[in-house]
Structure formats: C-alpha cells, structure tokens
A protein has these predicted regions:
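Short beta-rich binding modules
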Residues: 1-136
Length: 136
C-alpha cells in the first residue's frame, strides 16, 4: 500500500508530495501461526501472503473439523506413522469459504487454536514424548 506524504510550507521551491510505501496492518486481523509444541503468534496479511507464496508448490492444507478454518503446512514434512499420517512443526491457519482464503479476526484466533489443539496426538520415540497434528 502506498501513502502520500505532503509537505506544504508555502515554499514553492521545497513544497512537495511524495509517494511512500508503507505496510499498514490491522491489530484485530491476521493469520494464526501455531506449532505442535503449543507456541503461536499472529501475522499480518503481508507476512501471511509471503508464507503462502513459499508454500505454493510444497503446501498441504487440512480443514480443522467442520469449521471454515484450514491449516496449511509444508507437505514435504508430513510423516507416516503406523496408523496414518501426522505433522510436527508449525502451520498457518486462515479461513476458507470454498472460494478464497481470508484473515481471522476477533475471537476466531482462539477458536482456530482450539480446533488445532483438539487434533494433536502424543507420539513417543526413544522414550521422548512430543505432540503431532493428526492428519486425515
């Protein structure tokens, strides 16, 4: 997004208008980044788009139950276990209405996090326990 910086001081030599590129973001809107270890953060639309661009060729999406929330992750990092597939790491969660992705807002961050956490399973390897997202 560009903004216009106008400086007028009744000085015909130095008065000017300059286009400046800025990144404005809404505090109440964004995408949720959440990891299987419980850590999370909210990213703005610009960072969400950068992540989605990087996931373009390697991404895998999973709906979070019957909700409109979809978790997108690096599909190359999905692992097979005896009973199915799972993912360990972080995902980006946005809404999908069947046509387009959109940002989360308000209490949707908590709802999306709860949906994500409800799909975590505990795996054990060499005596070490860790959480993983169970995939359908």
């Amino acid at each position: 997004m560009e903004t216009l910086d106008i400086k007028i001081a009744l000085d015909p030599v130095n008065d000017r208008a300059v286009l400046k590129e800025t990144k404005l973001k809404r505090k109440d809107e964004g995408a949720l980044i959440i990891a299987t270890n419980g850590e999370s953060r909210i990213v703005d639309a610009y960072e969400a788009q950068e992540i989605m661009d990087k996931l373009n060729d390697i991404g895998h999406g999973e709906y979070m139950g019957d909700s409109d929330y979809i978790a997108m992750m690096n599909g190359d990092k999905i692992i097979n276990i005896g009973t199915g597939k799972c993912f360990i790491g972080s995902v980006i969660i946005m809404k999908f209405d069947g046509r387009a992705l959109s940002m989360l807002a308000g209490d949707e961050f908590e709802k999306a996090a709860a949906e994500f956490k409800s799909r975590l399973i505990t795996l054990v390897c060499d005596g070490q326990e860790f959480s993983a997202l169970e995939l359908l």
